[in-house]
């Protein structure tokens, strides 16, 4: 797998250290641009063993698009990534990490509805958590259907759910994602992006637009 492109942190990022089941979890909280809505979105990063982190450009663009819609965002590093303690645990420990981050968000931002989002491996982890943590909405970007991660027996949310998939994805089969979405009893909205690779090279602005358009109807009144 090609190493994920990275993002250079700016001073706008507010660093956090959250207590997690494997030790401290490195995170970054960002207020929305302009008028703030009572929503907080947690965005999960791609596979740690392939260079995935909260600084991945798809993750940061997702967070940027949401902030432009008035949504606060929280990115974090799974165990063993960056300053987060612990070691990779094939998704189960990472799910526990997300649970801990959700717990922090609920305690510190109890006035906000909780959205979950994720890219690739992060899309799988966030989907696994969505029903349990009562997420109010879900964004899944290039969910790794047909890869190493089983989508069988995952409780599926009945909340607003957006799936974005590049048609030229060299890692996740766009056809497999389309078939999976079509097989669901209550399928999410699927947006297919022509010419987009797994990491959305030269398509990040298009991704930003797809996210903004996709969540517009979910936004509460200011």
Residue ranges and their predicted role:
Residues 183-199:
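Catalytic histidine neighborhood in serine/cysteine hydrolases
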Residues 157-158, 162-165, 169:
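Short beta-strand/loop motif that positions the catalytic acidic residue
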Residues 86, 196-208:
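Catalytic histidine-centered segment of alpha/beta-hydrolase-like enzymes
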Residues 88-109:
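Alpha/beta-hydrolase active-site loop
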Residues 1-36:
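N-terminal cap/lid segment of alpha/beta-hydrolase-fold proteins
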Residues 34-75:
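Short, surface-exposed "cap/lid" segments of acyl-processing enzymes
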Residues 167-172, 198-199:
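Acidic catalytic loop of the alpha/beta-hydrolase fold
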Residues 117-126:
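Gly/Ala-rich beta-loop-alpha elbow adjacent to hydrolase catalytic centers
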């Amino acid at each position: 797998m090609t190493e994920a492109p990275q993002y250079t942190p700016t001073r706008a990022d507010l660093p956090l250290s959250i207590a997690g089941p494997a030790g401290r979890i490195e995170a970054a909280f960002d207020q929305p641009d302009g008028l703030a809505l009572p929503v907080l979105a947690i965005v999960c990063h791609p596979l740690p063993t392939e260079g995935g982190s909260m600084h991945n450009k798809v993750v940061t663009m997702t967070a940027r698009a949401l902030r432009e819609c008035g949504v606060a965002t929280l990115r974090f590093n799974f165990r063993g990534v960056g300053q987060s303690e612990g070691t990779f645990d094939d998704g189960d420990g990472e799910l526990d990490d997300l649970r801990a981050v959700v717990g922090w968000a609920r305690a510190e931002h109890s006035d906000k509805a909780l959205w979950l989002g994720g890219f690739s491996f992060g899309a799988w982890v966030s989907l696994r958590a969505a029903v349990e943590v009562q997420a109010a909405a879900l964004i899944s970007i290039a969910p790794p259907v047909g890869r190493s991660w089983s989508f069988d027996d995952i409780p599926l949310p009945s909340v607003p759910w957006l799936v974005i998939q590049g048609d030229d994805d060299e890692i996740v089969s766009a056809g497999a994602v389309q078939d999976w979405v079509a097989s669901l009893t209550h399928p999410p909205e699927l947006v297919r992006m022509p010419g987009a690779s797994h990491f959305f090279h030269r398509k990040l602005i298009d991704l930003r637009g797809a996210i903004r358009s996709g969540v517009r109807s979910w936004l509460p009144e200011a």
